[in-house]
Amino acid sequence: MEQQMYKVQIDGEEKSFPAGTTYLQIAGEYQERYPHDIVLVYVNGKLQELGKKLKKDCALHFVTTGETIGNLTYRRGVSFLLVKAVYDTLGHDKIEQVRIHFSVDKGYYCTIKGDLKLDQELLARIEERMHEMADKDLSIRKRSVHTDEAVEMFRKYGMKDKERLFRYRRVSTVNIYSINEFEDYYYGYMVPSTGYLKYFKLYLYDEGFVVQMPEAAEPEKIPPFQPQNKLFHVLKESTRGGDMLGIETVGALNDYVTGGNANPKELLLVQEAMQEKKIAQIAEQIAGNPQKKFVLIAGPSSSGKTTFSRRLSIQLRVSGLVPHPISVDDYFKNRVDTPLDAEGKPNYECLEALDVELFNHDLKKLLAGERIELPTFNFKTGKREYNGHYMQLGEQDILVIEGIHCLNDALTHDLPKENKFKIYISALTQLNIDEHNRIASTDGRLIRRMVRDSRTRGTSAKQTIAMWQSVRRGEENNIFPYQEDADVMFNSALLYELAVLKAYAEPILFGIEKDCAEYQEAKRLLKFLDYFVGIGSEYVPQNSILREFIGDGCFDL
């Protein structure tokens, strides 16, 4: 019987392959054309793992580790390799839990609970075991099991967080990955084998360690580990807040929401009270130093900067100060003088788009007690205007300034350091999906932004997803390099928020058509939100940072 052949379009050329050929085999024939390892493939626009088999005529587009989704797949593989190496090195009997917590620098912070002493010698053994498995190029197999079987499997393995998670899955089956006999669950796509996982380095850090990995820009280079101690402290502090409530993972949150003694309202109010306490402490710290006249607030997109600045201003008043907001946007250069980006559009995100000298001139005069007229930028005309907005600072007056570049000293180069108080704010998700699957803070911020932009700007989820990578690049250039220069960091993420945002985000994500380039990302986010049992928004306080995104807040934003 003649073997069935299928026509495959790749890189503008057509080639025939027998039915049942894996995409991994096809990728092998084309790998030398690509500068980085091929790890995934789009089949007629649908993202697939390389282990899948050819079943019909199709067009293929390969994905490498040099792309964002390929890099995430690589990191997922390293995480799996790491967890197996820990169990191989120590044995199951000595381990209570291996946990991958959150992102630190270019890697993940991890801890091991159990009968062990984590030191450099043990870490070296774990890393050596990881390299051994990578050198052997062991297959990473995938099998689909019934959800009930997965629950029982992870109960047997002592992976309690996964057991809890799957009790709330509405799908009937779950994909399980294995290296030899070691099985685990990972949210997202996986590399075909351990041979792809060549680049990683383990560093002792705090009570655990960091597994450092390459980024998409340089997928064969392990960046040196640069501790971010302030950011790490905030993340750890936020995680302790979840631990105090017994909520570390999505499964634990779902248990809390659905349990017989559950009171979601109490959870919301406790979380909000914890944030208010932190804001009050920041205000007291500022008020305790009379030299501080400029409160400079910066953070990435959808961090809740506006609501935070309003709530901080209220607490500053409680502390006896009189806060005045100033928008850095009012110091944009006239549009004719605005630098252009690569597409020839005005680039309002770069520092050069601002009249930095005028900004410093005005703030220095205010610091000296002089009365000045502040500008207002008219976005319709593209020009600065003066509309009679005068200001003069008294002894108790203080400026609250919010803007992308507020942590960058180049923005306030003429202002004395002793007069500045810098605050970095971000939504640093403290919740994990389970022990081995972290939630990227960028996902939380993207969902926040989609919900807000759909509600306030008429921007579709498709448009928000399409522009997100550009937003991220701006953050990488203008915000993240300066975050450790902040005097204080504030985490605006709330343990419960994704369970509330779910009801707002799902309808707009379902509106993205399958033939859109943004469909794969929408599909991924929908799968992610499906892990959560929803919480109604009726108990979210009107001054909550979350109200900046879902609406019905008390601030005029």
List each model region and its residues.
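Short beta-strand-centered segment that lines the nucleotide-binding/catalytic pocket of NTP-utilizing
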Residues: 318-336
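Auxiliary tRNA-acceptor-end handling modules of aminoacyl-tRNA synthetases
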Residues: 52-73, 85, 89, 94-104, ...
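Hydrophobic positions on the alpha1 helix immediately C-terminal to the Walker A/P-loop
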Residues: 308, 312
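Conserved NTP phosphate-binding and transfer environment spanning the P-loop NTPase/kinase superfamily
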Residues: 290, 412-557
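Conserved nucleotide-sensing/catalytic segment adjacent to the nucleotide-binding pocket
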Residues: 333, 337-379
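Glycine-rich phosphate-binding loop used to anchor ATP phosphates in small-molecule kinases
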Residues: 360-418, 468-482
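Conserved lysine of the Walker
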Residues: 305
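Hydrophobic anchor at the beta1->P-loop junction of P-loop NTPases
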Residues: 295-297
